């Protein structure tokens, strides 16, 4: 999608213990060599250097901008605000790693993530644990992907 000019950024959200793995391993392992990219990791209490990196998210550049956040950030206004600003400023993919973290439709972070989905040009979910306790566990994940998926169901 990046090579075809359809997107210029990605917001990747995962649990706290996992999201730094994206920076340290996953992105460089799977990114094609010809793609120039910059990774910025969310920290709710950034150092001076981290503040400069956060500012990079909103500057025009010719690289793929990747913003990594933990899912817990969406329980806070600060986290929601920066994710909103990022998505509004880019043609972005919004990806949720370990998407079972948004399985509870009534949870604050699930509501925040689902609300922000409309700002992303593309959405993806990833999970290594597709087994659920109930079919309703899939509802919020499906709603994140496609807002029209469950038009007749109200939770």
What are these regions (language model features)?
Residues 1, 14-16, 128-137:
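Conserved beta-strand->loop/alpha-helix structural units within folded catalytic cores of enzymes
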Residues 26-29, 134-145:
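PAPS/PAP-binding and catalytic site of the sulfotransferase fold
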């Amino acid at each position: 999608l990046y090579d075809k000019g359809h997107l210029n950024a990605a917001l990747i959200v995962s649990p706290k213990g996992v999201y730094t793995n994206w920076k340290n391993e996953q992105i460089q392992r799977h990114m094609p060599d010809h793609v120039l990219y910059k990774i910025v990791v969310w920290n709710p209490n950034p150092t001076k250097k981290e503040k400069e990196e956060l500012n990079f998210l909103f500057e025009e550049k010719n690289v793929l901008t990747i913003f990594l956040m933990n899912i817990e950030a969406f329980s806070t206004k600060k986290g929601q605000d920066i994710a909103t600003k990022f998505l509004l400023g880019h043609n972005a993919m919004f990806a949720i790693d370990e998407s079972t973290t948004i399985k509870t439709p009534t949870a604050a972070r699930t509501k925040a993530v689902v609300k922000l989905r409309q700002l992303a040009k593309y959405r993806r979910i990833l999970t290594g644990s597709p087994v659920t306790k109930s079919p309703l566990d899939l509802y919020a994940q499906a709603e994140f992907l496609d807002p029209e998926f469950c038009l007749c169901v109200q939770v």
